[in-house]
From Swiss-Prot:
Subunit and partners: Alpha-beta TR is a heterodimer composed of an alpha and beta chain; disulfide-linked. The alpha-beta TR is associated with the transmembrane signaling CD3 coreceptor proteins to form the TR-CD3 (TcR or TCR). The assembly of alpha-beta TR heterodimers with CD3 occurs in the endoplasmic reticulum where a single alpha-beta TR heterodimer associates with one CD3D-CD3E heterodimer, one CD3G-CD3E heterodimer and one CD247 homodimer forming a stable octameric structure. CD3D-CD3E and CD3G-CD3E heterodimers preferentially associate with TR alpha and TR beta chains, respectively.
Coiled-coil residue spans: none
Keyword Cell division assigned: no
Subcellular location field: Cell membrane
Domain of life of the source: Eukaryota
Cellular-component GO terms for this entry: plasma membrane; T cell receptor complex
Organism whose genome encodes this protein: Homo sapiens
Protein name per the record: T cell receptor beta variable 10-1
A Pfam family matched in the record: V-set
Domain Ig-like as annotated: residue spans: 22-114
Protein keywords: Adaptive immunity, Cell membrane, Disulfide bond, Immunity, Immunoglobulin domain, Membrane, Receptor, Signal, T cell receptor
Entry's Gene Ontology BP terms: adaptive immune response; cell surface receptor signaling pathway
Gene3D superfamilies: Immunoglobulins (2.60.40.10)
Length: 114
């Protein structure tokens, strides 16, 4: 069995003035083997056009992985190598780690904005 990796996916609930609106990430925690493909889901109910995936490593601030300004629009951030995203609707921006590596062990955050 290959080396196991632990991915901590932070559940990030953002406040935008709507009590029933939210942004959710899943799974909340993920352990996988090196080389496996991993997908982290991000779903928002605000109907925001802009969505973002960040990672935060020990001793560092947030670093942008990928972002989207609307359906079918995806862009690379500063640390996009080894990751991909897709945006087939307004609500979702899944992040895929193509081949999990120990260098991708991190806390992941999804965010959205108008």
């Amino acid at each position: 069995m290959g080396t196991r990796l632990f991915f901590y996916v932070a559940l990030c609930l953002l406040w935008a003035g709507h009590r029933d609106a939210e942004i959710t990430q899943s799974p909340r925690h993920k352990i996988t083997e090196t080389g496996r493909q991993v997908t982290l889901a991000c779903h928002q109910t605000w109907n925001h056009n802009n969505m973002f995936w960040y990672r935060q490593d020990l001793g560092h601030g947030l670093r942008l992985i990928h972002y989207s300004y609307g359906v079918h629009d995806t862009n690379k951030g500063e640390v996009s190598d080894g990751y991909s995203v897709s945006r087939s609707n307004t609500e979702d921006l899944p992040l895929t780690l193509e081949s999990a590596a120990s260098s991708q062990t991190s806390v992941y955050f999804c965010a959205s904005s108008e």
